Regions:
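Short gly/ser/thr-rich secondary-structure transition/capping motifs
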Residues: 2-4, 121-131, 184-189
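A short, aliphatic-rich alpha-helical micro-motif
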Residues: 11, 136-138, 195-198
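Fold-independent oxyanion-binding glycine-rich loops
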Residues: 20-23, 27, 70, 119-121, ...
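Short, glycine/charged-enriched secondary-structure capping and boundary segments
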Residues: 32-36, 80-82, 131-132, 157-160, ...
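Conserved N-terminal subdomain of the carbohydrate kinase-like
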Residues: 63-147
Length: 210
């Protein structure tokens, strides 16, 4: 079983990994030749970069908690059950009586994968900074979040910076994935926010392109 201390000897806390983000549900065609405009069978699978990261961390045997927000809709319940079944703690997830989970529909084109999103105003993007509790950070060792959250909306952006603030106050290492999404935004403000996060990160996980 992997331990945080093996990876980061200077990490404090119990070894718990906190992953902040938005859960999504992907609809993936069983037949790679199927187009979204055609009838066919699809698989539902939990997604969102943070959800995937949390499941991977738990899969390596790490004690991992997801920090985010879900609704009372069936897709929210499915996504929450899916990450819990993979060993991810959900005690830090905020439950809302309103809002819908964001959905993504995938198709395979000759030019590559193509996603059609239904996520504007999704419940997962409505996490508020005051919904983060310091107790969650008290015994943690690492906080991880992806940079694309900074461009969803003001509420999620403020929640990200608040989470980093709580991490620093509790001597929790901050792991940051730039996760650049040019289709969301690419301007001076975005670059400024990205640089601000990078300057606070203890661990940075960029791709070769980034």
């Amino acid at each position: 079983m992997m331990r945080i201390k093996d990876l980061f000897p200077d990490a404090s806390g119990s070894g718990r990994v906190l992953v902040l983000g938005e859960l999504l549900l992907d609809f993936v065609p069983c037949d790679s030749d199927m187009r979204l405009s055609q009838p066919g069978t699809v698989l539902k699978t939990v997604s969102g970069s943070s959800g995937i990261y949390a499941c991977a961390a738990a899969g390596f045997g790490l004690d991992c908690s997801f920090i985010g927000k879900v609704g009372s809709d069936p897709f929210s319940q499915l996504a929450l059950s899916a990450i819990a079944s993979r060993g991810v703690r959900t005690d830090a997830v905020v439950r809302s009586d309103s809002g819908q989970l964001g959905l993504a529909f995938l198709e395979y084109l000759p030019s590559g994968r193509n996603y059609t999103y239904y996520r504007d105003g999704s419940v997962g993007s409505q996490l508020r900074p005051e919904e983060l509790t310091e107790a969650v950070f008290a015994d943690a060792s690492i906080l991880h979040l992806p940079g694309m959250l900074l461009e969803l909306n003001d509420s999620m952006r403020q929640s990200c910076f608040r989470a980093v603030e709580l991490a620093k106050q509790n001597h929790v290492l901050f792991s940051f994935d730039p996760n650049l999404r040019k289709e969301l935004r690419n301007d001076a403000q975005m670059r400024q926010r990205m640089m601000q996060m990078l300057s606070m990160a203890d661990v940075i996980e960029p791709t070769l392109e980034e």
